[in-house]
From Swiss-Prot:
InterPro entries with a match to the protein in the record: NdhO (IPR020905)
UniProt function note: NDH-1 shuttles electrons from an unknown electron donor, via FMN and iron-sulfur (Fe-S) centers, to quinones in the respiratory and/or the photosynthetic chain. The immediate electron acceptor for the enzyme in this species is believed to be plastoquinone. Couples the redox reaction to proton translocation, and thus conserves the redox energy in a proton gradient. Cyanobacterial NDH-1 also plays a role in inorganic carbon-concentration.
GO CC annotation: plasma membrane-derived thylakoid membrane
E.C. number: 7.1.1.-
Keyword list, A-Z: Membrane, NAD, NADP, Plastoquinone, Quinone, Thylakoid, Translocase, Transport
Compartment annotation: Cellular thylakoid membrane
Assembly: NDH-1 can be composed of about 15 different subunits; different subcomplexes with different compositions have been identified which probably have different functions.
Name under which the protein is recorded: NAD(P)H-quinone oxidoreductase subunit O
Family: Belongs to the complex I NdhO subunit family.
EC category name: translocase
Membrane topology, record value: Peripheral membrane protein
GO molecular function, a single term: quinone binding
Length: 71
């Protein structure tokens, strides 16, 4: 998926849970990553900075291949 700043996305559970990043940290991901709308605020290489606005959470960097358009 080609992404750009301002796109509304969510994380793909299967790709995030089986990733190298998940194996290096806590694998209990909060549900808002998969269920709520996040806005791409920056992109650096293969990673996108996502801001989830509905809940008071910090922004998070995810690989762009772990994201899908929020429908």
């Amino acid at each position: 998926m080609a992404v750009k700043k301002g796109d509304m996305v969510r994380a793909i559970r299967e790709k995030l849970e089986n990733s190298l990043e998940a194996k290096a940290s806590d694998t209990r991901f909060p549900p808002y990553l998969f269920d709520s709308k996040g806005e791409i605020v920056d992109i650096k290489g293969d990673y996108a900075l996502i801001k989830f606005g509905k809940v008071p959470t910090p922004n998070v960097w995810l690989r762009v291949d772990q994201l899908e358009e929020f429908k």
